[in-house]
């Protein structure tokens, strides 16, 4: 058997191309056609060109916020869909996805020119519309998600177009206001990236996460980028040593394989730093070596070779081939001790598993040159989680209950914690939130009178970190003297911190009012005047104040010198 092994070292780059925002439309169109030429037949390319001409004419007078021609956006969306190797109807719908909503073109026009299938895809994207997501509005969030899952059920390609649309919008966010950048990035990280993950499309998911991190935590992103660049040679030398050793042993065993090493994505590194409470310099498993082989048998054979070469870390082996993830992902994962005691991860999978890992559900809509049959066929059972969601939607009228179940079972919102009040209301809090955060999310009066908390019927300390599904009961007392300043070092949310600070400011203000009133009464007695007489112009002019309450609070001593 001929031994064949290819190796690559690369920093994480955009796998799906990111054309320059100001590239002329005609040049982008050529890029789209070039992308299609290797796998699509001439008839399909001609159909896409017809869709381009209609989209170009419809958007001819429109501009984006950047000032560039609007048509650039749908072309870039179509390029992303073509790189996912989706069918021509999806690519055509990508080009046309904004024409019904933003131009005079009608649904009937699309049906007449391109057929019912393309028109339905465009209609699906139009109806899905702009998500109005806010982390404090559970009802709105749940309704948006219901809408998205129903669209998925009708035709999964609608969501694929929407993901491509969001990806290009995230790539060109530099022209938006900072507050809009953060809003869109939070929406992306909380909704779009998790859905891309649930559909198994890692090529889109990882880029969405990285782009969202860039705008949500720009300082963190820049620090990570600098750190990775500064130690690039050292890290690449480390991973190259691993790749070369693995290549030699795999070749010797006669296994045909493609081997590459890569630095993990920014968001993945950031999560690792947060979860492990480490700096980037303290983390060495920033790398993953990937081995791609022809058969499942070769996967396990390669695993045996690797475990003979390096000492595996107990508890860090995962067999996702025997037990695939719900999003169709399959691979063998093992973490090992490498040179100088530094840990690193190896992933082993077949070439087909790799295609599914990169493209997810899109891999099963892949254009087939000799087969125009579309659909998921035998792969439909791998979307059982979507059918389960649809069953929940039918059975649940309560949006809060639906969202809670969705979070618990599908892990769509990993960065937030969803807890219940004793009455069953859902509270969404930042990961790491405490019972104090929970109390202030209900009302400031509840937080200010809080003296304890029970979680799932058990008394917990104030610094307990709430978990998904916790039922939280806040214990209050009218005899409470108010919050402690120590709470400011415990709470997670800015809302709770602000309300605690407001309480202390108010207390200081009330104490000043009492003290000021005492001084004013003493002053009035010494001058043989009544308190209301202080509002006469001669007194107000002397102290340069207009309101008696302000005299009470801030200027009581100034009157003593009159």
Residue ranges and their predicted role:
Residues 1-16, 21-22, 104-106, 116, ...:
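Terpene synthase/cyclase
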Residues 9-41:
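Short, contiguous pre-domain boundary segments
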Residues 24-28, 107, 115-118, 124-289, ...:
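Internal insertion modules embedded within essential enzymes
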Residues 39, 58, 136-139:
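N- or domain-start disorder-to-order transition segments that initiate the globular core
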Residues 50, 60-94, 101-109:
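Alpha-helical phosphate/pyrophosphate-handling elements in metalloenzyme active cores
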Residues 72, 87-96, 117, 121, ...:
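Alpha-helical scaffolds flanking conserved acidic
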Residues 292-294:
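Short hydrophobic/aromatic beta-strand micro-patches
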């Amino acid at each position: 058997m001929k031994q064949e092994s290819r190796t690559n070292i690369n920093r994480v780059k955009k796998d799906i191309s990111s054309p320059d925002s100001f590239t002329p439309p005609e040049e982008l169109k050529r890029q789209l056609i070039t992308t299609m030429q290797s796998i699509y037949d001439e008839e399909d390319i001609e159909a896409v060109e017809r869709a381009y001409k209609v989209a170009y004419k419809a958007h001819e007078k429109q501009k984006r916020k950047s000032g560039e021609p609007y048509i650039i956006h749908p072309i870039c969306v179509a390029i992303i869909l073509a790189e996912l190797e989706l069918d021509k109807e999806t690519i055509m719908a990508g080009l046309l996805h904004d024409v019904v909503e933003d131009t005079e073109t009608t649904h009937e026009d699309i049906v007449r020119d391109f057929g019912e299938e393309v028109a339905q895809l465009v209609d699906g994207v139009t109806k899905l519309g702009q998500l109005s997501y806010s982390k404090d509005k559970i009802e709105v969030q749940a309704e948006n998600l219901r809408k998205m899952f129903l669209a998925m059920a009708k035709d999964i390609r609608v969501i694929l177009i929407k993901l491509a649309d969001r990806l290009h919008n995230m790539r060109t966010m530099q022209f938006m206001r900072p507050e809009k950048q953060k809003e869109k990035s939070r929406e992306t990280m909380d909704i779009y990236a998790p859905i891309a993950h649930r559909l198994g499309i890692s090529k889109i998911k990882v880029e969405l996460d990285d782009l969202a991190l860039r705008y949500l935590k720009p300082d963190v992103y820049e620090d990570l980028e600098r750190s990775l660049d500064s130690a690039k040679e050292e890290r690449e030398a480390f991973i190259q040593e691993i790749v070369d050793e693995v290549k030699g042993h795999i070749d010797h065993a006669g296994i045909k394989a493609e081997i590459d090493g890569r630095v993990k994505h920014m968001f993945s590194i950031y999560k690792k730093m947060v979860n492990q409470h480490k700096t980037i310099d303290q983390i060495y498993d920033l790398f993953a070596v990937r081995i791609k082989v022809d058969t499942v048998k070769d996967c396990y054979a390669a695993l045996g070779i690797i475990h003979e070469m390096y000492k595996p870390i107990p508890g860090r082996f995962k067999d996702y081939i025997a037990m695939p993830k719900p999003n169709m992902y399959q691979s063998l994962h093992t973490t090992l001790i490498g040179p100088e005691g530094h840990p690193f991860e190896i992933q082993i999978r077949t070439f087909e598993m790799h295609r599914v890992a990169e493209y997810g559900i899109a891999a099963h809509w892949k254009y087939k040159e000799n087969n125009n049959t579309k659909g998921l066929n035998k792969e439909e059972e791998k979307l059982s989680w979507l059918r389960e969601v649809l069953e929940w939607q039918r059975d649940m009228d309560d949006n809060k209950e639906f969202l809670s179940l969705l979070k618990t079972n599908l892990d769509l919102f990993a960065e937030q914690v969803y807890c219940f009040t004793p009455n069953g209301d859902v509270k969404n809090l930042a990961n790491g939130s405490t019972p104090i955060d929970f109390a202030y999310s209900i009302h400031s009066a509840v937080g200010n009178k809080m003296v304890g908390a029970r979680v799932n019927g058990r008394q917990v300390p104030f610094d307990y970190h709430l978990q998904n599904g916790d039922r939280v009961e806040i214990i209050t007392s009218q005899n409470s003297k108010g919050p402690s300043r120590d709470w400011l070092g415990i709470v997670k949310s800015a809302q709770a911190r602000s309300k605690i600070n407001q309480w202390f400011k108010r207390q200081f203000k009330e104490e000043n009012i009492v003290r000021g009133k005492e001084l004013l009464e003493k002053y009035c007695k010494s001058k043989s005047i009544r308190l209301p007489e202080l509002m006469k112009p001669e007194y107000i002019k002397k102290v340069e104040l207009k309101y008696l309450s302000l005299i009470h609070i801030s200027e009581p001593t100034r009157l003593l010198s009159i």
